[in-house]
Amino acid sequence: MIPARGGSVGVPRKNVRRLKNKPLISWTIEAALGATAANTIIVMTDDDEIAGIAERHGVRVMREEKTTGKQTLDDVARKVIHQLLEEGAHPADAFVTVQPTCPFIKGHRITEAVELLKNGAGSVLTVVDDRHLTWTRAADGTPRKEYTQRVNRQLLPPKFRETGGVIATTIGHFQEHDTRIVEPIHLVEVGTEEALDIDHFADWMVAEYLATKLSVMIRVDAGVSLGMGHVYRALALAQELAMHDLQIVISADAELSREFFAQHPFTVTEITDDAAFFALAEVSRPDLIILDHLDTRAEYVETLKRFARAVVTFEDLGEGAEKANMLVSDLYRNRKVQIGRAHV
């Protein structure tokens, strides 16, 4: 069940507002469609536009009257479950609520929740580790700390906050307890991106950044014959591109590269050969691959272009330079200077 009202205060009409290239609710519907455990997907809404979007995705729509917004999600779930039972649903069937305001939740989280229910969980909730130095107030207003020692956040004990992204139980458990939160409870920990719940425009701005950031892979090495210039340039590029999903790829036997990047906070992946790099690129499907390891072969670059939107190579005198989307080199002047938006 994806409950989606037409009205919202913090971000007006947020469920139909376009995030990147599609309405916000489409992100969650597509995640649900990608869940192997999802047999029936229902968008519960009071809004014609939301209903139309859901129908275009091919999922079921259940309508409700416009409310004051004081209705709880358990109230909505009660209506949907009542209808499902009339249509032949069984008490053992999993019932999963997925919030449309959590656009980065992954479909496999729904599948994971259903599997946990099959294995005896009463409820399954997605949570994010939100440990901080927190305070509360006593009944008389006196501040009280909720920690024992003032230490760095990473050293505090885990403290989990519900994301609201996924809450799962069975129809039978809901009938018996009249709530979606039933013991024994299992927690599925997600990262900060999946945990994002859009309430205000500040959240929306974060969502726009997450939706539009690029995936970048830098292939580089250092060594006695190669020197260190390549890794220093890769470091400069990495620092400029750090706001994107960045991965530095080095050879497993390149000890100098390993030691160099161990001093810096970037994700480094080691590969054994070109085949391993191709396999990594095929799985990652990056927006951009940057090559900085001298002369490349034409077939090498052509293979990488099958997996990436663009391939850029540096100081490359090999045949692969002709196949790359862009060559950056101080070794010679361009015979034809390409300028303008199409070449940026």
Task: Go through each PLM region and give its residues.
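A nucleotide-sugar donor-handling region in carbohydrate enzymes
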Residues: 181-206, 323-343
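Active-site and donor-binding regions of nucleotide-sugar-utilizing enzymes
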Residues: 223-225, 233, 239-240, 251-338
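Short, glycine-rich nucleotide/cofactor-binding loops
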Residues: 16-19, 215-231
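Short internal beta-strands
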Residues: 26, 41-45, 126-127, 245-253
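A short, N-terminal amphipathic alpha-helix
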Residues: 24-40, 52, 236-244
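Short phosphate-binding loop-to-helix
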Residues: 42, 48-96, 104-112, 272-284, ...
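Conserved core of the sugar-phosphate nucleotidyltransferase
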Residues: 73-79, 102-191
